Amino acid sequence: DIKDGSLCIEGKNCYTLYYNMMLFFANGGSTCYIVSVGSYEDALNKNAMLTGLEKLTLEQEITLVVIPEAVNLNSNEELRDIQQQMLSHCGDRMKNRFALLDIYPKADENTNIEDQVTIFCTNIGSNFLSYGAAYFPWLNTSVVGDRDLTGDVFVWTDNIYANRNKLSDID
């Protein structure tokens, strides 16, 4: 049930970094480095994410490596490749940082937690595991308050850039 004056977002939002950052700072996070790997006009891309990971070698102060939108890539294999590279980056190349990893979302409602964990453990491999951790199950929460809701309906598409005019029209 949608109340008057609320914003209803339907569909999957692949671009979650803004909300991830809101939660990071709301829970005591401070200094944070963000590497841009594209725009809303671009689809999420494994190679762009890996290029962004490579750029982190230029900054020595980084202690925690997180790529939260990697779980929104097209396949479990793409997520696996990124996470293996994150562990290698932290444990082999830099040796001074830690990777926070996510477990790929359920394929469907019949997928059980044990299967998700088994797939993750099989895919992640055995290299540099002391340089990373996976937190599971996911914590689903909202970072949008009632005062942020306007009554408009917005439907996510594969490319949010196509909806940029709808977003700019919302007061």
PLM-predicted stretches and their roles:
Residues 1-171:
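Surface-exposed assembly/interface segments
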